[in-house]
Each structure stands twice: as structure tokens, then as C-alpha cells.
Amino acid sequence: LGHANAIKLLASLLDDMSDDVDFFINNISGGAVRNAIPSKAQCTICVPEKEIDTAKSKLNELFKVQKEIYAKTDPMMTLEITESDKKDALGYAQTLDLIHFIRSLPNGIMRMSPEFSGIVETSINLGVINSDNDCVKICMLARSLNSDALSDMINTVKSQCYLLDNVEVEESNRHEPWSSPSKNRLIDVLNESYK
């Protein structure tokens, strides 16, 4: 619990760096499956040559702060910066829209169960991001013990998507939640036996 989501962390670093350095996203990727917290993310950015050293320094400085925040949960977290000769990139406004959008997406536990102590009721995971030319695909997984809470979480993400131009939303593989019956003889017997 509390592990860093590499995609969200990358967006945070880039967003914070944008205050000091102009850059343009060439490509971005991270995560492997939508139901796991991504441990790796990478992004190729184009930076004016005169700002390369500033960008590296700023990213290292910002990463140091994040490393301290996640020292207990992710002690092996690393940042690798290498130079590339790639030149094609999103426009400046598109770059900022993308990193602001990623950073604003909900992620993690949204609500604990009011019925079962210590059990998560509703959560969401930003699991995968991949870019291909001018298209960026983001995969998220929302889960809930409550059907209405699940719908609300999905609709919250859809609403955020509709705030941007040229964004398509696809909902797939929805699994309706089920709840354990509160009164059930078998559960009562198992609970008594377990004590």
C-alpha cells in the first residue's frame, strides 16, 4: 500500500519541471497491465539544446524529493536520464495538456468500506500508458464492492476526459461487484471455527 505509480510520478516530475524548462513529449510509455501499479515508466522529451543541462539538473532535484517521499515503500526507485536524437514531438500545448491530464487522473484508494473494517470499497489504478505517433492510450482499472460507486468512478474519469479535445473513451471488461451476504449460516460457522 502506498507504492509510487511510475506513470503518475513521471507526469509529476515533468509537470514540475515545466515551470523552469520548455520541452515537448516525443513518446511516453509505462506499466504492463491495467490491474497492477506500474513500477516503470519512460518518456522521451525534446528540449532546446541550451536547456538540456537545466532539464537534467531539475529532474534530478525533483526526483530526489520524490525518492524521499517513497523511501519506505519504494527504496529501489531510480531515475535514468539519457540523451536521444529524436526530434518529432507533440506541440507545447499538447505536451502540457497531456502531463496535466495524467497528473489529474484519480489513482489509488478512493473509499474504504463502511461495512467491513479495513477493506477497500472503491479504488482505481492508472495501469498502462503508451504513445504511438500522435495517439496516447491510457488504460485504467476501476474496482468497487458497490455498483453505484463503480459507475461514479468510471463517470468521473469520463468527465475528465471530455474536458480535453480529441479524447475518446472506451469502457470495457466491466466486472459487476458482488457483496457478501451479511447474514449467512455458513459464514457464521466459518467465523466461529476460525476464532
Outline where the language-model segments fall.
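Midchain, well-structured core segments that form catalytic/ion-binding scaffolds
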Residues: 1-143
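Active-site-adjacent substrate-binding region
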Residues: 14-18, 22-28, 154, 179-195
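Solvent-exposed, well-ordered amphipathic alpha-helical segments
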Residues: 47-56, 162, 168-169, 189
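A general structural signal for well-ordered alpha-helical packing
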Residues: 56, 95, 99-102, 123, ...
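Conserved hydrophobic residues forming the short capping helix/wall of the S-adenosyl-L-methionine
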Residues: 63-67, 161, 194
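Short N-terminal secondary-structure initiator segments
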Residues: 75-85, 107, 112-114, 164-187
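Generic hydrophobic alpha-helical scaffold/packing signal
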Residues: 127, 141, 158, 191-194
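C-terminal structural cap/anchor segments
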Residues: 132-186
